[in-house]
Amino acid sequence: MKYLGLAYFTPEKFAAMSPDDVKALVSQCPALDEKMRATGKVLVSASLGDLDSWRTLRPRSGKTHVSDGPYTESKEVVGGLFIIDADSHEEGLRIAAMHPAATLGEEGGWAIELIPMDFYLAR
């Protein structure tokens, strides 16, 4: 079963962190990312660009309307994603728990949401 992992952060909390705290936090991420990759189950792993460069596309009167910024009502914003191919739900949870946002970053509002995928099309 394939699972989409969404890595969330809270921009206000993250912005309140000192540069040294951010650097210390981020410096721990590569080792955890590598631990996930070493399972051989990670198909995709990505961090997302600056929120100021996000665009939202919506259908409006038969045309596609583009607006600035993320479309979200939440204080938490998706900052990264991953897709894993797990043999079971338990394995999916175990692998997702290795992600930095599941183990670090409480002060930045980090969290992971793990979602079973019904459809997956790869190149």
Question: What does each model-found stretch correspond to?
Answer:
Residues M1-R123:
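Conserved, structured core segments of small domains
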